Regions:
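N-terminal localization/anchoring segments of enzymes in phospholipid and broader phosphate metabolism
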Residues: 1-349, 353, 357, 381, ...
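Glycine- and other small-residue-rich loops at beta-strand/loop junctions that grip anionic moieties
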Residues: 177, 367-368, 402
Length: 511
């Protein structure tokens, strides 16, 4: 009873209820007006047609256009208001301009190394094109690898995170989708408190919606009182707004501008298996050192400036260029981010490029598999061309409707020769792709529409780095403890289940 009362009085429940009431009010307003007035009803259908024409001409994926047009033309009283509140993944014009100014101000602090670009071009033209895709769209340059370390679990990563936090002398930047009370947060805060006492600058950004049920109500006040500068991204407010759909899904830790961490894990106990939710929680991440850390530092500073409405460029947190040792055997590394600010969907396009250009194999970890046409076609074409394409998704889901959508993608992929595995020990939250022993991405992006189009995400693109062998090794070990899905099992779904899957697939791009 106490837990039920806590949920009913929680910010998430109260704010969500107010938003739902507003949505119902808008639908009721449209409905009553259309019933009361034939003229309004006719105007509504004219508006639906005009809005559909507008959507056709927008810079948007065709399958997303079709989903919206179907909803708007079939149920205008629902589709039209829904589109204006939820139909635009990109930020509002005012927000876009402000964020664009900040991004443009920091871009010169990440200069390109033309000699390095040329070295990659002469080494592998496919890798060079993938690198240029990132640089041309996101202005994040290519770096020579200094040190990369892959972690195949949250526990493994946490040990390294604590060690790096203890070594901080100048600053610590942390940006996470979820920060939750528990053992993990307590151990981190113990270190941060000591560092603040010794003059280390500590800053934290967390996503308000992601952390809404996990973080203490007065977290910001508590942090500020001990000298930890804390900000929340996009506060979850009781009002319908386009921007409420855009979430900061990134997971970034930067220490002194010399080392950075990212991956699937947030700051909460389930990510290090101190709290069991869906069996064993498997996650993955990466630690990088060297000049490439400047990219993570500027990612954080851009978001910090945006939240603070600060237009100053804080280059004092960047390390000078060309100060890190680089061996001839080192590979190439390119951290970058993707956001609703752009129309180019760099993360998705890079995945498509890696899959399409693979010559031997492509192995993928993702908690959700809700694919757009481009990614689906790339996987199917690669598998039909004889490429060993394998995907691991959870056996135990965290969101049942999303899992039903994930399973709806199985059959066409398996029919084409893609091998799909269910991670039987529990829930796999890793977001990785590795191909041909030389190319990999580790980051925060799921293979679903929300990550690809709505969220702020971060990635590390790698070519021939030290840790790629370990990523492949982790994939092979994970296949061994997972259950492969065969074509026959995709038929064992009831009629009601298939109908629900079909409906979810139709509206998947809108969810």
């Amino acid at each position: 009873m106490r837990k039920i009362l806590q949920r009913l009085l929680s910010k998430l429940f109260i704010v969500s209820t107010i938003i739902i009431i507003q949505m119902i009010w808008w639908f009721f307003l449209f409905y009553t007006a259309s019933v009361a007035s034939r003229v309004f009803q006719d105007l509504l259908y004219v508006a639906a047609i005009l809005l559909s024409i507008y959507i056709v001409n927008r810079r948007m994926k065709m399958y997303i256009k079709m989903s919206w047009i179907f909803l708007i033309l079939s149920v205008p009283i629902v589709g039209i208001p829904c589109y204006f509140f939820f139909g635009r993944p990109e930020l509002t014009s005012k927000t876009q301009k402000r964020m664009a100014r900040i991004v443009e101000a920091y871009a010169p602090l990440r200069p390109e190394n033309e000699l390095l670009n040329e070295t990659l071009r002469l080494t592998d033209m496919d890798a060079y094109r993938q690198s240029r895709l990132i640089t041309q769209n996101q202005k994040y340059p290519l770096y020579a690898e200094d040190c990369t370390e892959y972690f195949k679990s949250g526990e493994e990563a946490f040990e390294s995170i604590l060690k790096d936090l203890r070594s901080a002398e100048k600053f610590i930047f942390m940006e996470y989708f979820i920060i939750g009370s528990g053992v993990m947060l307590d151990q981190i805060l113990d270190i941060l408190k000591e560092k603040v006492k010794h003059g280390v600058v500590v800053r934290i950004i967390y996503d308000d919606f992601g952390s809404i049920n996990a973080i203490p109500p007065h977290f910001i006040k508590e942090m500020e009182s001990i000298g930890i500068q804390t900000r929340r991204f996009n506060p979850y407010k009781p009002m319908l707004s386009v921007i409420m759909n855009d979430r900061d899904h990134r997971k970034i830790l930067v220490v002194d501008g010399r080392v950075a961490h990212t991956g699937g894990y947030n700051i909460a106990d389930e990510y290090i298996n101190k709290k069991i939710r869906f069996g064993y929680w498997k996650d993955a991440g990466i630690r990088v050192e060297g000049e490439c850390v400047n990219s993570f530092t500027t990612m954080f500073l851009e978001m910090w400036n945006y939240i603070n409405k600060d237009n100053a460029v804080h280059d004092e947190y960047l390390n000078p260029h060309n100060t890190f040792s680089q061996s001839e055997e080192s590979g190439f590394v390119q951290p970058f981010c993707d956001s609703p600010l752009e129309h180019d969907d760099v993360g998705e396009n890079l995945y498509v490029s890696i899959i399409s250009r693979a010559k031997k194999y492509v192995y993928i970890f993702t908690p959700y598999l809700i694919l757009g046409t481009e990614l689906s076609h790339a996987m199917i074409s690669a598998a039909r061309s004889g490429i060993d394409v394998r995907i691991v998704v959870p056996k135990i889901p965290d969101k049942k409707l999303i899992y039903l959508q994930t399973k709806a993608n199985f059959r066409p992929l398996i029919e084409a020769g893609v091998r799909i595995y269910l991670y039987t020990p529990g829930f796999i939250h890793s977001k990785c792709i590795v191909a041909d022993d030389d190319t990999a991405i580790v980051g925060t992006c799921n293979l679903d529409f929300r990550s690809m189009y709505w969220n702020f995400e971060d990635f590390v693109y790698m070519y021939r780095t030290q840790c790629i062998g370990k990523i492949k090794e982790d994939a092979i070990e994970t296949f061994a403890v997972s259950e492969e899905v065969y074509e026959e099992s995709t038929n064992d779904i009831s009629f009601a289940g298939r109908l629900l899957q079909s409906i979810l697939q139709l509206f998947a791009p809108l969810l």
